[in-house]
């Protein structure tokens, strides 16, 4: 019997919250969970080298199927020996299916049973993406974890629309499984949809669990719904997911949502947030959000976060970084991106330690208080 490409090992369950501490084993090594995955859209985490990502203990990164299909082309990545060799990253990689980009970037799209017709957001060319094509591209990319091609419904959507969408996503998931040519080397995750409707999340989860994927994702959240709705959906969705397989919440990366997601049984998260906000000088610190472009930092020669031991905070001042961001210097974006990624990866280390010590609930209270999430006008990102 061949070993599955992806295997989840549960190490400990937090007695205070039920959060899970675990390890996901992949063909390119293992990573501890709960884990945050930095996003490398174009086969690079913007402005960061693979060595820097390793310095900050990134165990796995994410790359985008849609973007790499358009440029440079999955054939070129395959010829290079796969994504790991192409980008010089020897740790695990997860690729999304391209579905989210088709639904979010393309103005013109037509959903059919076969797949989605849409226009290339770069040049307007007509393109078609189907479950089979999404599998072919990801098999060429050679990621450790691949995602099934799903329909990404808008928020909000009616129950009737969402029901049709959920059933289509299930039919597409079956086709993905049939088309996946390298199951021993790449693990394919199914994506549970259903919006905010409990009956539809159950319908989606039950159908996908029957297909027996090596892991499952929760899609259709972090698309504009309030935080309390996201938490409620997680509360009724994660119990429907197999306890012996990884659970991945797609597109979530704010510190409060990472902690709240872990408390609700999620193992993996990804988001462009830390690097996207870094580019305009917004930073995550142990005491909350800091916008370094603000005039009050012009003569502030202290570090971004006195409690942070990252390269940025050990070497550069708020005043200097403010100057770099205001003059649009690339080095400034590198420094802010490094800090934000380090901050979230460090936060996940603290979350894992709190689970180990059965005190994630206490950790959440302390963190929210210090960060300012408990205040009436709490600012998020």
UniProtKB/Swiss-Prot annotation:
One of its GO terms (molecular function) is tRNA-guanosine(34) queuine transglycosylase activity. Its cofactor is Zn(2+). This is Queuine tRNA-ribosyltransferase. Catalyzes the base-exchange of a guanine (G) residue with the queuine precursor 7-aminomethyl-7-deazaguanine (PreQ1) at position 34 (anticodon wobble position) in tRNAs with GU(N) anticodons (tRNA-Asp, -Asn, -His and -Tyr). Catalysis occurs through a double-displacement mechanism. The nucleophile active site attacks the C1' of nucleotide 34 to detach the guanine base from the RNA, forming a covalent enzyme-RNA intermediate. The proton acceptor active site deprotonates the incoming PreQ1, allowing a nucleophilic attack on the C1' of the ribose to form the product. The lineage of its organism: Bacteria, Bacillati, Bacillota, Bacilli, Bacillales. Substrate binds at residues 96-100, 150, 193, 220. HAMAP family: Q_tRNA_Tgt (MF_00168). Belongs to the queuine tRNA-ribosyltransferase family. Keywords: Glycosyltransferase, Metal-binding, Queuosine biosynthesis, Transferase, tRNA processing, Zinc. One of its GO terms (biological process) is tRNA wobble guanine modification. The active site is at residues 96, 270. Pathway: tRNA modification; tRNA-queuosine biosynthesis. Binds 1 zinc ion per subunit. The gene is tgt. Zn(2+) binds at residues 308, 310, 313, 339. Homodimer. Within each dimer, one monomer is responsible for RNA recognition and catalysis, while the other monomer binds to the replacement base PreQ1. NCBIfam families: Q_tRNA_tgt (TIGR00430), tgt_general (TIGR00449). Residues 251-257, 275-279 are annotated as: RNA binding. It is an enzyme of class 2 (transferase). It comes from Lysinibacillus sphaericus (strain C3-41). One of its GO terms (cellular component) is cytosol. It catalyses: 7-aminomethyl-7-carbaguanine + guanosine(34) in tRNA = 7-aminomethyl-7-carbaguanosine(34) in tRNA + guanine. Its EC number is 2.4.2.29.
């Amino acid at each position: 019997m061949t070993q599955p490409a992806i295997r989840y090992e549960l190490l400990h369950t937090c007695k205070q919250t039920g959060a899970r501490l675990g390890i996901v084993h992949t063909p390119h090594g293992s990573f501890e969970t709960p884990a945050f995955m930095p996003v490398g859209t174009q086969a690079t985490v913007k402005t960061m080298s693979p060595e820097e990502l390793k310095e900050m203990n990134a165990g796995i990164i994410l790359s985008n199927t849609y973007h790499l299909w358009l440029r440079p082309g999955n054939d070129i990545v395959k010829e290079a020996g796969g994504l790991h060799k192409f980008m010089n990253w020897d740790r695990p990689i997860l690729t999304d299916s391209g579905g989210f980009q088709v639904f979010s970037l393309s103005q013109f799209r037509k959903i059919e049973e076969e797949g989605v017709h849409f226009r290339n957001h770069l040049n307007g060319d007509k393109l078609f993406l189907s479950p089979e094509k999404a599998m072919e591209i990801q098999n060429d990319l050679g990621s450790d974890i691949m995602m099934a091609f799903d329909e990404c419904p808008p928020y909000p959507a009616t129950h009737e629309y969402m029901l049709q969408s959920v059933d289509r996503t299930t039919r597409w998931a079956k086709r993905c499984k049939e088309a996946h040519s390298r199951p021993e080397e790449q693990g394919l995750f199914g994506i549970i949809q259903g919006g905010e409707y409990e009956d539809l999340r159950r319908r989606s989860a039950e159908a996908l669990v029957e297909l027996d994927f090596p892991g499952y994702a929760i899609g259709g959240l972090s698309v504009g719904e309030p935080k309390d709705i996201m938490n409620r959906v997680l509360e009724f969705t994660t119990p429907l997911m197999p306890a012996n397989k990884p659970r991945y919440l797609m597109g979530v990366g704010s510190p409060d949502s990472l902690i709240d997601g872990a408390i609700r049984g999620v193992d993996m998260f990804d988001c462009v947030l830390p690097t996207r906000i870094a580019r305009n000088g917004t930073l995550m610190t142990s005491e909350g959000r800091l916008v370094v472009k603000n005039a009050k930092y012009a003569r502030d020669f202290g570090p971004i976060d006195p409690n942070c031991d990252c390269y940025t905070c050990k070497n550069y001042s708020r005043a200097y970084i403010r100057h770099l961001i205001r003059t649009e210097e690339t080095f400034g974006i590198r420094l802010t991106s490094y800090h934000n990624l380090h901050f979230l990866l460090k936060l996940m280390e603290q979350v894992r330690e709190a689970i180990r010590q059965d005190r994630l609930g206490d950790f959440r209270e302390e963190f929210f208080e210090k960060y300012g999430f408990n205040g009436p006008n709490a600012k998020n990102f």
